[in-house]
Amino acid sequence: MLETTIDFSRYSSVKIGTPLKVSVLENDDEISQEHQIIGLANNLLIAPSAKNLALLGKNYDYICDKGECVEIGGAANASKIFNYFRANDLEGLEFLGQLPGTLGALVKMNAGMKEFEIKNVLESACINNQWLEKEALGLGYRSSGFSGVVLRARFKKTHGFREGVLKACQSMRKSHPKLPNFGSCFKNPPNDHAGRLLEGVGLRGYCLKRVGFAKEHANFLVNLGGAEFEEALDLIELAKARVLQEYGIHLEEEVKILR
């Protein structure tokens, strides 16, 4: 098993972190239940003390036409998947033109934008070398019900790439901040929006040391420059406490915190 050092202050989308050892997994028999897969670290906040970090190597970066379905390796990135579906006139993953991440993370969190999400197109996934049908994965709103590493997944083939869906997703992205961030900080509570709640307690544009909630959209935690893990964690806890006190609602993080 190969090992490398990754500086997460450069590698992660929020640009917060320290240099840490990361295992590079190239074969199924190297996978362990203890591994914390980092992918491209787009929706992660990684502690300086985080252990068992790993990423899938180049052997998992592929897209293969299987006839009735498309099989995609866990390390294939969203841009590559989007371009394949568009070039082959396939529908269902148009939103990946506006989302970062690797296939493994996209399946694990049932990634999506509004009503467009991974589970709408997914057929099955190989978790720790065991194939599971979609129904067994427990996919919900930005969540899943399985533990383990997504090594590969299969998607149904339906012809007819939808440019209209892509344009709708592009329009949604216009409100996203330009500063380093990890996408939505919190999941939307049932019948409400995290951004509305955060704005309601005065956190839109609010800064705490070197982190803050974006002026463009309150549900985006941004790195104002040189921020550290504890600063981001403090702001997340502050936001949860304020929303709970004001609205009686427990906000749940969409960002994954690895310790």
From Swiss-Prot:
Q: Which cofactor does it need?
A: FAD
Read off the InterPro entries from this record.
FAD-bd_PCMH-like_sf (IPR036318), FAD-bd_PCMH_sub2 (IPR016169), MurB (IPR003170), MurB_C (IPR011601), MurB_C_sf (IPR036635)
Q: Which SUPFAM superfamilies match?
A: FAD-binding/transporter-associated domain-like, Uridine diphospho-N-Acetylenolpyruvylglucosamine reductase, MurB, C-terminal domain
Q: Which residues form the active site?
A: R142, S184 (proton donor), E254
Per the record, its GO cellular-component terms are:
cytosol
Compartments in which it is found: Cytoplasm
Which chemical reaction does it catalyze?
UDP-N-acetyl-alpha-D-muramate + NADP(+) = UDP-N-acetyl-3-O-(1-carboxyvinyl)-alpha-D-glucosamine + NADPH + H(+)
GO MF terms, alphabetically ordered: flavin adenine dinucleotide binding; UDP-N-acetylmuramate dehydrogenase activity
The disulfide bridges present are: none
- Enzyme Commission code: 1.3.1.98
One GO process term, biological-process aspect: cell wall organization
Q: Which Pfam families match?
A: MurB_C
Which pathway does it operate in?
A: Cell wall biogenesis; peptidoglycan biosynthesis
Q: Which keywords belong to this entry? A: Cell cycle, Cell division, Cell shape, Cell wall biogenesis/degradation, Cytoplasm, FAD, Flavoprotein, NADP, Oxidoreductase, Peptidoglycan synthesis
What is the protein's known function? Cell wall formation.
Q: Which family does it belong to?
A: Belongs to the MurB family.
Name-wise, this protein is: UDP-N-acetylenolpyruvoylglucosamine reductase
